[in-house]
Every structure is written in C-alpha cells, then in structure tokens.
C-alpha cells in the first residue's frame, strides 16, 4: 500500500525540501519499496499492510 508513514503518536513523519533520501530510507526500513518527501511529510510506496499510515478519517496525531 502507499501512504504517509506515521510515528508512534500517529503523526506523519515531517520532512523538508531536499530530504527525499531521508524519507526513502525511512520507507525502506518499514519494508516499503521506496519513498520521497511530499512536503511536508514522507510518502511511501509498496508498504506492507501491517504498517500504519496516516488516515485523515481517523487522525490520532497528538502532541502527548
């Protein structure tokens, strides 16, 4: 599956212009095929179904 990867709080992995190599690394560490910085967050391709991705209908992002 494709989507924005999220961290433990449910927030997207933030990125900035020029950080596509960092996003690609984070995506492949999660067993995705590749990824890039779709500013302001990392977008991944080919993620396994077990990896949680951002869902705007069920956004649990918090600052806690």
From Swiss-Prot:
One of its GO terms (cellular component) is extracellular region. This is Toxin Tce3. The keyword Secreted applies. Has the structural arrangement of an alpha-helix connected to antiparallel beta-sheets by disulfide bonds (CS-alpha/beta). Keywords: Disulfide bond, Ion channel impairing toxin, Neurotoxin, Secreted, Toxin, Voltage-gated sodium channel impairing toxin. GO terms for biological process: defense response. Expressed by the venom gland. One of its GO terms (molecular function) is sodium channel inhibitor activity. It comes from Tityus cerroazul (Scorpion). Disulfide bonds join 11-61, 15-37, 23-42, 27-44. It comes from the Eukaryota.
């Amino acid at each position: 599956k494709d989507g924005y990867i999220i961290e433990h709080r449910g927030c997207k992995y933030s990125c900035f212009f020029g950080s596509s190599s960092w996003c690609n690394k984070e995506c492949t560490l999660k067993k995705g095929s590749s990824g890039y910085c779709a500013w302001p967050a990392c977008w991944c391709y080919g993620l396994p179904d077990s990896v949680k991705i951002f869902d705007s209908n069920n956004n649990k992002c918090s600052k806690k």
